[in-house]
Amino acid sequence: MARTFAQFRGVTKAIVGIGRWAAAQSTVYDAATERERRALHRQGVSAEVSGVFVTPDGDTPPTALNDRMIGVSAAQLRAIDEVVAVPYETVKAPAVRAALRSRLVGSLVTHTSLARALLETDTRTGPGTADVG
C-alpha cells in the first residue's frame, strides 16, 4: 500500500466524482454511519470530492472519518496538475460549487441542466453571478 500512495506524487491528471453530502448522492455518505454523518453535518460538510470533505465555502476540514479512510488527501489532490470532475444531477449544484471553491477541481464535464444550474444561481452572491470563489 505504501508504494501505491507514493505514486500520488507523480499523478498529473485525475478524473473525480463529486458527491452531495446526502443519502444516495455520495457513496461515502451512504457508507458512513449515522453518527459519522451527523458529525460531518455539524462540521458544515456539504460535499465530498473523492472522499475529501468540503464545506459550502470550499474549506476542507479535517474529520475523524478522514483518519479511517484510505485515499487521496486534499493536499495531494490540489497538487495534481489537472483534476477533472464529472458530476451528474442538478441537485448536486451546491456540491459542485463547493468543490470548485475548494480548488480541488479545475475542470468540469457535465450535462446542460447542471451547467445551467451552476450559472443561474449562486447562493453567496445571488442570481446570475456564478461566482465560484
Model region roles, listed by residue range:
Residues 1-133:
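Conserved phosphate- and dinucleotide-binding cores of soluble alpha/beta proteins
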